[in-house]
Curated annotation (Swiss-Prot):
Source superkingdom: Archaea
Record's signal peptide: none
PANTHER family listed in its UniProt record: PSEUDOURIDYLATE SYNTHASE PUS7L, TRNA PSEUDOURIDINE SYNTHASE D
GO molecular function ontology, one term from the record: tRNA pseudouridine(13) synthase activity
HAMAP family, A to Z: TruD
Name of this protein: Probable tRNA pseudouridine synthase D
Organism: Thermoplasma acidophilum (strain ATCC 25905 / DSM 1728 / JCM 9062 / NBRC 15155 / AMRC-C165)
GO biological process terms held by the UniProt record: tRNA pseudouridine synthesis
Top enzyme category: isomerase
Length: 411
């Protein structure tokens, strides 16, 4: 085992596991079944992308093809500091061979009548080089984790931002109707930001100076400053961002609420125990839930449900609170309600009549998962996870994670 330990970790024997010291150390490849059609309406490209944020690469593709970014879709967002094999769908008659820039390479291209949407994946395959722990240690922790029924399906830390881990805090302000405060926190958060130009703009609102000082790489922040220059108010400033980016703040806050609920759920009932009033879903081998077939747990079927959970046929799913998804009817639902009371929010607040694109209906997320085809050799972990399940969350069960993906892109 590595001797890389923090002082208070030595007694717990949890190593500090470091990943992404180089982007090529973290490879994620989308597993998708996209039907091909010679005369299909859409162009699908499969690309290798290194050290690009998903939203920024979409902007680059759109710019190179001279089309709106709205004509480009993808199945999943990925970490910036990584090597990604990712699919994109282009709804325009364009020549994709012109796409040539650093860190981007087309592996395959074909036509399809299938329009690619977020979540149109079977799984993600990961190959991750790590430091700070031995292969034997990782193997032992993996076996223990599998014996315990898998790992908690928390949203990963990147959901809440990279260096500036405040995306959910901005989302909380949006949900509670404090739009101007939300914009201010996005532009400058004293907990994380040391750049004078951020602080100076919030203090002076001198947008001309801010547009001179804010680096052009911070294009989303600059878009908001440009909005303020035109309207002299922060209210409505999130309209200056692409809609899929502005809703990320709300989704991050929902993820924060889910993680709080899951943590208390494990503390009270353990990882995989179903109780009457729960909702469970059938899962496939990658732990993708079939949400079209919910199973309501009651006093009669609870023992059978727990047996099916042990056999990895079912998983309990907690609510991702939204306008159409509220706390459960189980005993644990009372704890879920208490969390919302502490946050001073309720489900109705996720329906935003003033800015409908910042509304979220909510969802459900399974409480645990397992990696598929896991192996470790020469300080490289190799495994596959279902869609929306975070590799960083899995690795965090093995040790205290240090993720070098610390580039600030505002999210």
């Amino acid at each position: 085992m590595s001797s890389t330990m923090s002082a208070d970790q030595s007694n717990r024997a949890r190593p500090v596991i470091r990943i992404k010291e180089n982007p090529e150390d973290f490879t994620v490849e989308e597993v998708a079944d996209i039907p091909k059609s010679d005369n299909g309406k859409y162009t699908i490209i499969k690309a290798e992308i290194i050290d690009w944020d998903t939203n920024r690469i979409v902007e680059e593709i759109a710019s190179a093809l001279r089309i709106s970014r709205k004509r480009i879709s993808y199945a999943g967002t990925k970490d910036k500091r990584a090597r990604k094999i990712q699919y994109f769908c282009i709804n325009a008659p364009v020549d994709v061979s012109v796409l040539a820039f650093k860190g981007f390479r087309i592996i395959d291209r074909f036509r399809s009548d299938h329009y690619l949407r977020l979540g149109d994946l079977t799984a993600n395959h990961f190959r991750i080089r790590f430091q700070g722990a031995s292969d034997d240690y990782i193997e032992q922790r993996y076996e223990k984790m599998m014996e315990c029924g898998g790992f908690p399906n928390y949203f990963g830390q990147q959901r809440f931002g990279s260096r500036r881990r405040n995306t959910h805090d901005v989302g909380r302000l949006i949900v509670t109707g404090r739009y101007e405060d939300a914009v201010r926190l996005y532009l400058y958060d004293e907990r994380y930001d040391i750049e004078d130009y951020r602080r100076e703009f919030i203090e002076t609102l001198d947008y001309n100076r801010a547009l001179e000082k804010f680096p052009r790489t911070l294009r989303f922040e600059r878009s908001i400053i440009g909005y303020y220059a035109q309207h002299h108010t922060f209210k409505g400033a999130f309209d200056a961002l692409p809609k899929n980016l502005s809703i990320m703040f709300v989704h991050a806050y929902q993820s924060y609420l889910f993680n709080r609920m899951l943590s208390l759920r494990i503390e009270k009932y353990g990882l995989n125990r179903a109780i009457p009033g729960d909702t469970a879903f059938p899962v496939d081998r990658y732990f993708n839930p079939d949400k079209s077939r919910p199973v309501e747990v009651n006093e009669v079927n609870v023992d059978t449900i727990n047996q099916l959970i042990e056999r990895d046929r079912l998983r309990v799913a907690l609510p991702i609170i939204g306008s159409e998804v509220g706390p459960d009817q189980s005993d644990f639902g009372e704890i879920e309600k208490k969390i919302l009371e502490e946050e001073h929010v309720d489900r109705s607040m996720f329906r935003n009549s003033e800015y409908p694109h910042l509304s979220s209906t909510g969802d459900r997320r399974i409480v645990s998962a397992k990696p598929v085809d896991f192996s470790v050799s020469n300080s490289v972990m190799d495994f596959t996870l279902g869609r929306g399940i975070y590799a960083t969350t899995l690795i965090s069960t093995f040790g205290d994670l240090v993720d070098f993906d610390a580039e600030s892109d505002g999210f």
